[in-house]
Regions:
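Hydrophobic anchor at the beta1->P-loop junction of P-loop NTPases
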Residues: 9
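NTP-dependent small-molecule kinase module
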Residues: 148-220
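Conserved phosphate-donor/acceptor-positioning beta-strand/loop module used by diverse small-molecule
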Residues: 98-101, 133-155
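Conserved lysine of the Walker
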Residues: 17
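Hydrophobic positions on the alpha1 helix immediately C-terminal to the Walker A/P-loop
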Residues: 20
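Walker A (P-loop) phosphate-binding loop of P-loop NTPases
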Residues: 14
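ATP-dependent small-molecule kinase phosphotransfer cores
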Residues: 39-124
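Membrane-proximal helix-turn-helix segments that form the acceptor-binding/catalytic region
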Residues: 123-137
Length: 220
């Protein structure tokens, strides 16, 4: 039995992950490959919607309960959308691709400070991943953009969806913030090891150029 190839797209907000996931899916399907794509969190089901709502309610109030709730939300998505596709005795797909995975928990669900509480929180999440034998991906494509481009994209996306720019928290997108988030991703990828490797891809340039870089890395 040939297991599906499991690819994760990670990156900061506004990095272009969703676009690149779709482009890769279309490219692979043009080769006759069977491709399943999902995202984490998957807000298309009611349970994930409820868990996400509760996670956001806990934000900045109780970092541990927020982290546990976020893990529960992601683990629910994993059990529903990902694990069955990877472990089926009769695989229905050649590729399983997700827009975000558990690595985002390490980057987004704790305040950006270095202290014992945060470190213990990281180890707590890592312990749960190992306890439940959560499957590591074969490869991670990490898309990165500079803060100015990130802010521009967040503003553009917020306006397109009719949102409130004043509530978009644009001040969080700074060089220092981005560096800290990437540092957390690297920690997570080192400790929750992927099978083959990861690549940092610049998401700031031309969409097609980024797509070509991703195809080259994945050798597809």
């Amino acid at each position: 039995m040939v297991e599906p190839r499991f690819i994760v797209f990670e990156g900061l907000d506004g990095s272009g992950k969703t676009t690149q996931v779709q482009l890769l899916k279309e490219h692979l399907e043009s080769q006759g490959k069977r491709v399943y794509t999902t995202r984490m969190p998957d807000t298309s089901n009611r349970l994930s919607q409820a868990l996400l709502k509760r996670t956001l309610e806990l934000r900045k109030k109780d970092i541990y309960r927020e982290a546990v709730m976020a893990f529960t939300m992601c683990f629910n998505d994993y059990l529903r959308n990902i694990e069955p596709k990877l472990t089926s005795k009769k695989p229905g797909y050649d590729y399983v691709i997700t827009d975000r995975y558990f690595y985002s928990l390490f980057a987004y669900n704790f305040p950006l400070i270095d202290d014992v509480k945060v470190f213990n929180g990281f180890n707590g999440i890592l312990g749960m991943l190992n306890k439940f034998n959560v499957i590591c991906p074969d490869e991670i494509v990490f898309l990165n953009v500079d803060p100015k481009e990130q802010r521009r994209r967040i503003m553009e996306d917020t306006m397109r969806q009719g949102g409130d720019i004043d509530k978009a928290n644009l001040d969080q997108y700074s060089i220092q913030h981005n560096e800290k988030m990437i540092e957390r991703y690297l920690w997570a990828m080192e400790h929750f090891k992927l099978r083959l490797g990861y690549k940092m891809v610049s998401g700031a340039g031309n969409i097609e150029k980024t797509h070509e870089s991703i195809k080259k890395f994945l050798k597809v």
